[in-house]
């Protein structure tokens, strides 16, 4: 069990205005991340042309016409840019408001020596390719101690198990390691031909720290779970404590705040598939002590998230 007494809570700088337009972006920081990512990929940063996602004049005109056909006007700020983009030599980078750098390769990158994977590849294939990626893309990863995180494990209707490949920096400090795992990580995705075509560098802005808050243990969180204090999107009644199979400490975004939660994986008897394949639902319990939370999420049997 993790020996932690407190964890930080952060406030997101991003929000939606009255017209549901994204606001709070730091375009200067986004530009810096864009150029830094391009440099780490070996792109010629002196000759990059930075664009944004502002719709073309033709698209704007079509949108205005569509709104007019419904007797409405386009809301203020509807066409404002939200991301920055560069493209060069088959590499495209887009930095979005959440401070993620989304990288696409066209054509996709072919791995050497029979390496490579796709979403439903065996775990061993992903693991072998991860070691190659860790070395080949070390400049992009920019981590002192890159930890391989092969996560997922869901099965489709054909019994194929899907996994995702990520890396995060394994800091010595446990709190920082949790922060890195949740907010500062890089994911790699391959196409069906097992070629690398997509990378996402996550670098969330956590500069607005609310404070460090006392947290409960996983055992205490399970007691709250069993008493109905949780948040879930599972459409069934909670089946009982004997169906709780796993717990992990993660962060969720609630009303603009990044808050630590315990995520419990619970077997769902109603959702068991043919052949005895199990289905699990995620149930979330706040890790912050109850006296610091204004409204504990009490389960009322409704479909919530």
Predicted regions and their residues:
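Preferential activation on post-signal-peptide N-terminal prodomains/segments
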Residues: 1-178, 303
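Short, solvent-exposed coil/turn segments at beta-strand boundaries
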Residues: 90, 97-100, 189-195, 257-259, ...
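Intrinsically disordered, low-complexity regulatory tails
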Residues: 276-281, 285-292
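Short, low-complexity, Pro/Ser/Thr/Gly-rich segments in the mature regions of secreted, periplasmic
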Residues: 287-305
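Segments that shape or occlude catalytic/ligand-binding pockets
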Residues: 114, 118-280
